[in-house]
Amino acid sequence: LLCAALILGCAAPEKKTQEPTPQPEREDENGLAFAALSVINMREDPNYAAELGTQALMGTPVKVHAHDNGYWVNIETPDGYKAWVNEMAIVPIDQARLDAWKASKRMVVTNYYTFFLDAPRPDANHVSDGVWGDIVEYVGATGKYTEVALPDGKHAFVPTADVTELRSWVDSRKAVIPANAPQSDVEKARQLILETAKTFVGVPYLWAGTSIKGVDCSGFAKTVYFLNGYMLLRNASQQFKTGEPVDVSEGLGNLQPADLVFFGREATEEKPEKITHVAIYLGDGKIIHSSQLVRINSLI
């Protein structure tokens, strides 16, 4: 389903390639954890002034590699991105806990934004906020509310209309499409990606953002595809190497809806190829992308 096209032009600069971080005080190569907040900020170095590298959503299982000064933790997301988080942003777990979590009935937030409450009523106190794509464990149903367990073990209540059982949701997104799948399944998957992308229109640009709260260009593509059951790598230059290339040398006729369209500089004898921006193709010469905010523009 993933395809790539390179279009020459100018766009917001793509996130820089990760650079080595300072030597941590304590290695912890076998650690595991869950992202504990609705969206956790992952920084390139262990301090608040460091560049924001990416984000991870609540319930994301991560590897723990190192600790620095007892306050910052170096983690790795399932797509392989390594960066630093405040220790309060994650919950340490062991392999047994991770296995139990995988086997449990889980719920995914399917509303743009919600709140987890300490009682099943609208005027209850907030325990945490939640965003589209957050994953929690199912405990039970209480009227118009669903009781869930957050990654830190706290029980909370969320409007049932704001969550969906994870497995049925993944199945509904046509996440795995065999090579011999009917064309109708492929078209349905493309349509779901476009529907998801359009719901982000107006969401502000946020460097390194990967949630409905704010996205950068590659974070937008990554999040839209994630919300349809696909895992992309983090940066546009990495995404460009995913999937199959599409020839646009003679126009846009080979592009299909939901293809990724990349902007940048072709390689020359003096300079290497450089990817600076990514968008999702809507069809009819239009793209949707994050530039100042998520918007629709024409390439024609």
What are the residue ranges of the model-derived segments?
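Second-shell loop/turn segments in exported
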Residues: 123, 178-184, 204-212, 268
